[in-house]
């Protein structure tokens, strides 16, 4: 991909975040011209706030949604099992955990082709990029937090994930 295509993808991301497609503006900062960082509040459940990080790469745009909690070392194996079970069957994105510090995030990626076709396709793709992570955090976040803090009512990790998917 050439630098003009990447510059165009950066402009599409900015247009979306600035409300240029639907009027919904996002609070964000630009870092190193190809990265955007911001926050989302008002989610329902135990995890009410998320941060988002958007990286415009050579051929893709990736968004990470992170919660303001980290898995303690002694919980990382259980959290890893939880996110592995949650990820099974997901088609657009996945949970990840950084074993070095316990950060858990939801990652969504779209290709340059999703942004280069036309404005309607770009808007739909950006909407998925920005809204899927919060949706997954709302779906799985309460039981993930329960597991992190030991409030599982003696339910297994498998039961906790199944409860999210009911």
Q: How would you label these PLM feature ranges?
A:
Residues 19-46, 61, 67-68:
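Ser/Thr-rich, low-complexity intrinsically disordered terminal regions
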Residues 51-72:
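Intrinsically disordered, low-complexity regulatory segments enriched in Ser/Thr/Pro
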């Amino acid at each position: 991909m050439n630098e003009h295509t990447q510059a165009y993808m950066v402009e599409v991301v900015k247009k979306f975040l600035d409300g240029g497609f639907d009027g919904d503006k996002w609070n964000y900062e630009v870092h190193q011209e190809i990265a955007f960082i911001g926050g989302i509040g008002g989610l329902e459940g135990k995890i009410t706030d998320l941060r988002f990080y958007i990286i415009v790469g050579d051929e893709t745009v990736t968004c990470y949604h992170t919660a303001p909690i980290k898995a303690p070392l002694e919980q990382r194996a259980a959290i890893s099992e939880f996110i592995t079970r949650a990820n099974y069957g997901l088609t657009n994105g996945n949970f990840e955990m950084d074993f070095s510090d316990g950060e858990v995030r939801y990652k969504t990626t779209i290709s340059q082709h999703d942004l280069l076709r036309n404005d309607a396709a770009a808007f739909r793709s950006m909407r998925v990029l920005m809204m899927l992570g919060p949706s997954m955090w709302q779906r799985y976040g309460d039981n993930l937090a329960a597991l992190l803090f030991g409030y599982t009512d003696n339910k297994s990790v498998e039961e906790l994930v199944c409860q999210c998917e009911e």
